[in-house]
Amino acid sequence: MSEFKRLMRLKLKMKQKRPEFKRQDWFKCSRIGTSWRRPFGKHSGMRIGLTHRAAVVNTGYRGPVLVRGLHPSGLQDILVNNVKELVALNPEVQGARIAATVGKRKRIEIVKKANELGIRVFNVSKQKQEEFLSL
């Protein structure tokens, strides 16, 4: 377990050091936006990797394989649409994220059942959970 915690700490440190990858010349016109696109220009300093240019996406920025894609709490993030899907989760290694398409009535049912089973719900705040449990 200590190895897992070490890797989670390493993942956090790597995330803090990871630069914000932005599209080349994103600041020149707002129309193109900032979302990442690989630079292909023949004379592109960013593509060549000049030090005074923005960082380019590389495999070296990835986190450790064993903890890649996990929630910062260390649990696997599982999308849940109903109570049946929630019951199938393992509370020790998995946490629930309620889908955006789920309505309030079913959301309340899912939160109550998750509390019963000891499953963590990532996208419902503590105050909302208390409010739902009191209904």
UniProtKB/Swiss-Prot annotation:
**InterPro entries linked to this entry:** Ribosomal_eL32, Ribosomal_eL32_arc, Ribosomal_eL32_CS, Ribosomal_eL32_sf
Q: Looking at the Swiss-Prot or TrEMBL record, what is one Pfam family this protein matches?
A: Ribosomal_L32e
Keywords (A to Z) from UniProt = Ribonucleoprotein, Ribosomal protein
This protein's source sits in the domain of life called Archaea
**What GO MF terms are annotated?**
structural constituent of ribosome
GO cellular component terms, A-Z: cytosolic large ribosomal subunit
BP GO terms, sorted: translation
SMART domains (alphabetical): Ribosomal_L32e
Which protein family is it in?
Belongs to the eukaryotic ribosomal protein eL32 family.
* NCBIfam families the UniProt entry points to: PRK08562.1 (NF006332)
Name the record gives this protein: Large ribosomal subunit protein eL32
What organism does the UniProt record list as the source? Methanococcus maripaludis (strain DSM 14266 / JCM 13030 / NBRC 101832 / S2 / LL)
The organism's taxonomy opens as: Archaea, Methanobacteriati, Methanobacteriota, Methanomada group, Methanococci
